[in-house]
Each structure stands twice: as structure tokens, then as C-alpha cells.
Amino acid sequence: MSPLLPSFPFAVLALADGSIFHGFSIGAPGETTGEVVFNTALTGYQEIITDPSYCSQIVTLTYPHIGNVGVNAQDAESDRIHAAGLVIKDLPKRVSNFRSEAPLDAYLTEAGVVGIAGIDTRKLTRILRDKGAQSGAIVAGKAGDDYETLGKKALELVKAFPGMAGLDLAKVVTTKKPYEWREGEWDLHGPNGTPAYRTLDTSKPTYKVVAYDFGVKRNILRMLTERGCELTVVPAQTSAAEVLAMQPDGVFLSNGPGDPEPCDYAIAAAKEIIEAGVPTFGICLGHQIMGLAAGAKTLKMKFGHHGANHPVKDLDTGRVAITSQNHGFAVDASTLPANVRVTHVSLFDGSLQGLAWKDKPAICFQGHPEASPGPHDVSYLFDRFMELMNAAKKEGK
């Protein structure tokens, strides 16, 4: 345990099964509730907690040392922290990275996010693995507060959290109005030799793409931009008619938090766009929405997939890729219609990971080909989307 932590106020994590963990507050004072999940990634803690897909979730990071490199503005995947809370084992006393702008605990405090450190994250992860993701609460006290009082309060809060099933959180995290995106990938040799994100040459865009924001990560937009996409990002509830009126070369459906089934507005829009023959690509929640639009069903997973080391098999090539994953729901392969085929499966549990339409230019993937954090083994899926748009252009659609 870091020598810094004992000087911090007490904090308590309580689970719905009655488990209580004692630790120290590393964020804002107060309380938070959410679904407690674990992420096995060794790096990328800032990208993880700023991923909108973690809205209403308390994230447990299994790697013991979190905060080593601090945080900076460039690595955030959205405009703020979306995780409901953070659980870690050890907060280093010092950060060590030339890009660091602030320590993790200061970042959490400034954002008003509750965090806890100093607990046995291995024990917590085993509970979540064996019993499944469950509701939880963190109560971060002030100087003088005791564990018994904080624990009782945390257990009361857990009972009030409704769980993730049935929650439409895409409406919560989506942009309020459309915007243009022109930022590309990170360039170590940017202007004047200074590292910076590249900017799309708008005088020569290759594809006009409309991106639905259900909680989109910035690195997804960057990877699309890098391939010549002139992006218009639209709110989650934008109708298919509005999107089709823009005459896009392709439509992208983003990642996002919560249960896909309540997103009836998005399911209806996706169905109409796919039926119109517009090349369509979905990731994560977007993948689930496309599955529902095809007529399939989704199911709640026991503890989901959260990490950067998940092996996935591409059934078209036979190749295995290591992927970044972050989802608690999945498309039920047994409910797929005849015109949709499975393209990828998880080698951890056999769950469905990718789909392709036999009669339409539409593909989707459950994991995160943009990584951030994680490997880029399946970044070729972005290229497949470009191929679909190229083919549609040649056909004059």
C-alpha cells in the first residue's frame, strides 16, 4: 500500500451481496452508486474512466498500480469522466511521465468523482467473476468519519440503485447538437516537430460519414478521420430521415453505455438506414443496436467483457486477434435472422463478436477496434467500412 494513502480520509465500497471493503478516498468526498465491474487492462486508466460507455458503472482496475503516469488533456476519450466511481489497489505517491499534467487523485477530485484505493481488488474481482457484476456504492468520508458509519450508509445506497438492465443511457451521454469532427490520429512529429493530433485536409475528403453519438470515444472518430472521412456527429435521437437527407457515403453507430433494448429510436433509425442500402458500421452499443434492428435479441452478460486482452476469432480468415472490450450486453446468436451471419466470436466464452449482412453493406463489431487503451489488431474493420463505401460509390448508390 502506498505510504500516501493512510493520510487520506476513510472510504468504503459496499456490494449488493453485502460485501464491504475498507479503503481510503482518492477523489471527491461524497457518495456514488453504480454497477461494479472489473477491467483487466494494465494501462490506459484515463481513457477508461473518460469512456462514456462506463456511465453509471463503478470501475475496478485489476492492475495493482494505477496513477503512475498521471493524466493529461490529450488522453481523455471524452470531455469528462463518465465512470460513476473508481476502485484501485494502490495509488503511487509520485507520477512519472513527461506528458503528465496532474495526478490521478487531483483529476478525480476536480471532476467531483468518488474513488477508493487500498482495498483487495483481487478479492473483489473474484466476487464479481463468480457472482457476476452487481450494484455497489462508494462512500468517501471526511476526516473523523469511521468505517462502521460509512459502511452502513453504503449498504443503504446499494439497495436504491436499479441496476443497468432497462436503462437507456445513450440519451444521457450523447451530444446535444450536431458537430463536425476533423481531428486525426496522434503524430509524434507534428507541426514544428511537436507531437500533436493530425487534422483532416477538408479540401480532399474521401468519404462523407454521419456518426451517431451514443457515447462515442474520440479515438474512434480519429481513426475514421485518418481514413479520409469527413465526419458529422449527430445526437442519438436523430431520425433516419434526417441522416439520409445529408446523403452520406456511410453511417457509423458508436459505442455507448447501458441496455440497448430501450433505445427504440436508434433501433428504428438503424433499420431504416440499413434497408436503404447505405453502408453502415457499428461498434459496441452500435453493434447491439444493429443486431436488434435486424430482428435479433440481446442478453445481459454475467460480468461482461472489460479489458484489453480478449482473444477474438475472425471466422472469415481464421485469424485470432487480441482486442479491447467493454460491454455488459451481447447479441444472442441463436436469434439472428437468415440474412445476417456471424463474422467474429470470443475465444473466452464463445459469445458473438461480429456480424455482416448478406444482402446489405452493413457490418458491426462488439469490441473496440480503436482500442484506446489496447491493441489495434482489429483496426482493419475500419478499412472494411471504407471498402463498403467504395463499392457503393462504384455502384452509384
From Swiss-Prot:
Function: Small subunit of the glutamine-dependent carbamoyl phosphate synthetase (CPSase). CPSase catalyzes the formation of carbamoyl phosphate from the ammonia moiety of glutamine, carbonate, and phosphate donated by ATP, constituting the first step of 2 biosynthetic pathways, one leading to arginine and/or urea and the other to pyrimidine nucleotides. The small subunit (glutamine amidotransferase) binds and cleaves glutamine to supply the large subunit with the substrate ammonia.
Biological or metabolic pathway of the protein: Amino-acid biosynthesis; L-arginine biosynthesis; carbamoyl phosphate from bicarbonate: step 1/1; Pyrimidine metabolism; UMP biosynthesis via de novo pathway; (S)-dihydroorotate from bicarbonate: step 1/3
Transmembrane segments: none
SUPFAM superfamilies: Carbamoyl phosphate synthetase, small subunit N-terminal domain (SSF52021), Class I glutamine amidotransferase-like (SSF52317)
Organism expressing this protein natively: Polynucleobacter asymbioticus (strain DSM 18221 / CIP 109841 / QLW-P1DMWA-1) (Polynucleobacter necessarius subsp. asymbioticus)
Subunit structure: Composed of two chains; the small (or glutamine) chain promotes the hydrolysis of glutamine to ammonia, which is used by the large (or ammonia) chain to synthesize carbamoyl phosphate. Tetramer of heterodimers (alpha,beta)4.
Taxonomic lineage of the native organism: Bacteria, Pseudomonadati, Pseudomonadota, Betaproteobacteria, Burkholderiales
Protein name, entry field: Carbamoyl phosphate synthase small chain
The organism's place on the tree of life at top rank: Bacteria
Record-listed L-glutamine binding positions: 53, 256, 258, 285, 288, 326, 328-329
A single BP term in Gene Ontology: glutamine metabolic process
Enzyme class, spelled out: ligase
Residue stretches making up the Glutamine amidotransferase type-1 domain: 208-395
Name of the gene: carA
Keywords (A to Z) from UniProt: Amino-acid biosynthesis, Arginine biosynthesis, ATP-binding, Glutamine amidotransferase, Ligase, Nucleotide-binding, Pyrimidine biosynthesis
Span list, region CPSase: 1-204
Active-site annotation: 284, 368, 370
PANTHER family linked: CARBAMOYL-PHOSPHATE SYNTHASE SMALL CHAIN (PTHR43418:SF7), MULTIFUNCTIONAL TRYPTOPHAN BIOSYNTHESIS PROTEIN-RELATED (PTHR43418)
CDD domains xref list: GATase1_CPSase
Catalytic activity: hydrogencarbonate + L-glutamine + 2 ATP + H2O = carbamoyl phosphate + L-glutamate + 2 ADP + phosphate + 2 H(+)
Similarity field: Belongs to the CarA family.
GO MF entry, a single one: carbamoyl-phosphate synthase (glutamine-hydrolyzing) activity
A Pfam family the protein falls into: GATase
Annotated EC: 6.3.5.5
